Amino acid sequence: MHNIFKGLITALITPFKDNKLDLYALERIIKHQIKHEVDAVLIAGSTGESSSLSFEEYKLLLQTSVEIVNKCIPIISGCSSNNTTYARALAAESTKIGVDGFMASPPSYVKPTQHGIYKHFEALHEVCNLPIMLYSAPTRSGVDFSDETILRLSKLPRILALKDCGVDLERPLRIRATVKKDFNILTGNDEVVLAFNAQGGVGWTSVASNIVPNICKELLEKWNKNDTKGALEIHQKLLPLYTALFVESNPIPIKYAAHYLGLCENEIRPPLTEASDSAKKQIENIITSLSIKI
């Protein structure tokens, strides 16, 4: 099975207007990503406010995204839930709609054992024929995969990758030493992309690339061509942006940044709130200093 989980994957925001999906803005957002040749887009992840979506909205979001992308790049759907039955329904619907793969985290809040995490993903694996990326986000889910559970899950034929949002930079080395050769490891933290890939990562699921996909793509291309100096120069330039985009809970800052650049409304669903005035000012200053334009 072809492994689509590599390179630059943008964790897309979900645009809303008047508390409904803004499908016109969605088209602008996706076409901006296609224009700058990202390797894939992730729809309905945590950056996409997936927990705020009804099942019908989730379906509409995926269906519209598939139509807009029209097979130009792979689409990865988010299928995380603390209810295994509901997560299976998301995975089954993703398969039916025609996405190219999906990502899921361990069930949040309920704090399953490692065996429970394994059984959750085994159930998702059984319900579809799509490639799967594990999503390690312990600060969000409250629980994480052990290295042993990752190894065990990697033996299932369609579990092909791990997105790691942790800060243990030794982890990709440990995982790489035990898993099958075609199992990919990607970082979900913009600020550690180079350090992570130096330790065995093969890509990056990025929040910042919602607004600077061209610069993020250039960074990875330089890294992959062994132009370490060039990659570091770009990374250093982007560090203030990475900081600004996490000055408040993701996706609050990136939603405002996208709005400021004309991609969508600055509408975010409760319990999240729009960016504070100080956060807005910080984001505006960084966008101006980097001369970011859409």
Swiss-Prot record:
Domain of life: Bacteria
Catalytic activity: L-aspartate 4-semialdehyde + pyruvate = (2S,4S)-4-hydroxy-2,3,4,5-tetrahydrodipicolinate + H2O + H(+)
GO annotation terms (biological process): diaminopimelate biosynthetic process; glyoxylate catabolic process; lysine biosynthetic process via diaminopimelate
Documented EC number(s): 4.3.3.7
InterPro entries attached to this UniProt entry: Aldolase_TIM, DapA, DapA-like, Schiff_base-form_aldolases_AS, Schiff_base-form_aldolases_CS
Protein's pathway: Amino-acid biosynthesis; L-lysine biosynthesis via DAP pathway; (S)-tetrahydrodipicolinate from L-aspartate: step 3/4
Protein name: 4-hydroxy-tetrahydrodipicolinate synthase
Lineage: Bacteria, Pseudomonadati, Pseudomonadota, Alphaproteobacteria, Rickettsiales
Gene behind this protein: dapA
